[in-house]
Every structure is written in structure tokens, then in C-alpha cells.
């Protein structure tokens, strides 16, 4: 009887975690625009990705962070939805979020990126996809 009760409690707890998105899924972060960590991750992902694109001459930069979701794994996955645009900074320069501003005539694109941050603090861009302008 005790083991049946424990099993029911365990299964109920798993069901609650799955239903609320706590168990392995992404959770949306409220007040993401007030958190400078998310903006820094967005700039890291955008500048890293744009520097690796063949034929590009300028970095892309973040115009706006639209949405942030996190997933706890062996570290944290940050799924960021962004508005990005080509910046005034050439790829031959060093990217700086304060000086690499969007070009006045640049088209803004909506992009989704996933940045993985390990438990040791190392970051990498897992994916970066944009809708057509």
C-alpha cells in the first residue's frame, strides 16, 4: 500500500512538471528587457553568427530583444527572439554593442537563436535562423 501511494505521488509530480513546462522544456522569462544579461547574450549570438557568414562585410547588431526562453540542461539554453539589422561596423573591426549601431537604411529581420552557456560559463551559439526581410 505504501509503495502504491509513493508511485501515485511520483507520477503526479512528473505530470505537474510536464504540464507546467518545468520538466525539460523551455520557460518564458518575464521582464527580459530589464535584464542586461539577455541583451548581452543577444549581442554575443548576433555578432558571432554574422562574423561567420560568407560574403558579409558588416556585423549584424541587435535592434530589439523580443522574447527570451530558458531551458536548464547541463548548463542553460537561452532561446532568444530578436530584431536584427546590419550595423555600421565592418567585420574587420572589433564588435562593440555600444558603437555598432544599426545602419539607418538597414532592413530589420526577426531571428531566433539558441545560446548554450555551460556550468563553467562558456558560451556557444547552437543555432541562429532569420526570417526573410
Swiss-Prot record:
Disulfide bonds join 89-100, 111-130. The keyword Signal applies. PROSITE patterns: CYSTATIN. It is found in: Secreted. Residues 1-19 form the signal peptide. GO terms for molecular function: cysteine-type endopeptidase inhibitor activity. The record marks 24 as: Reactive site. One of its GO terms (cellular component) is cytoplasm. Monomer. Can form homodimers in vitro, but probably not in vivo. Homodimers are predicted to be inactive; dimerization disrupts the interaction with target proteases. Belongs to the cystatin family. Inhibitor of cysteine proteinases. Inhibits host immune responses via its inhibition of host cathepsins. Contributes to the suppression of the host's immune response to tick salivary proteins and is important for successful feeding on hosts. Inhibits differentiation of host dendritic cells. Inhibits proliferation of host T-cells in response to antigen stimulus. Down-regulates TLR2-mediated host responses to infection by B.burgdorferi and the production of the chemokine CCL3 by host dendritic cells. This is Salivary cystatin-L. It comes from Ixodes scapularis (Black-legged tick).
